[in-house]
Swiss-Prot record:
Keyword Nucleotidyltransferase: yes
Keyword NAD: yes
The protein's name: Probable toxin y4kH
One MF term in the entry's GO annotations: nucleotidyltransferase activity
Position of the signal peptide: none
Amino acid sequence: MRERAVGSKGSFPIGIAELQEVSCASVEINQPLLLADLRSDGMLRMRIPTDAARAASHELGKQWSRALWLHDEKPDGIIYDSRLNGEANTALFDRALPKLNVKSSGPLLDFRDEVAQILDDFSLEIV
């Protein structure tokens, strides 16, 4: 959706049908996670190209994600700065599942408070 909104003015319309296809879960961590930290100078220290975490295309990111998954330290996932708003994002690998507990899950639109905040924060409009 990020790239579709480039250059638009005012609220950006998103179809309700698209949102109805998305599921969401609230998850709690029940054991410490080992994350490869790609924030700040982490990518530079690990010799990972900037585009692995910041390009619009995800191809290079997928390759580096696989390389990190295969690493001997067996990280549970990665933490990186969002290219959209600079906030920290976490992507977890399958091996992290035993360290998590799903508190609730369901269609995205069932999480009304969270969806309302996202719509407001990013000037989105459901059509």
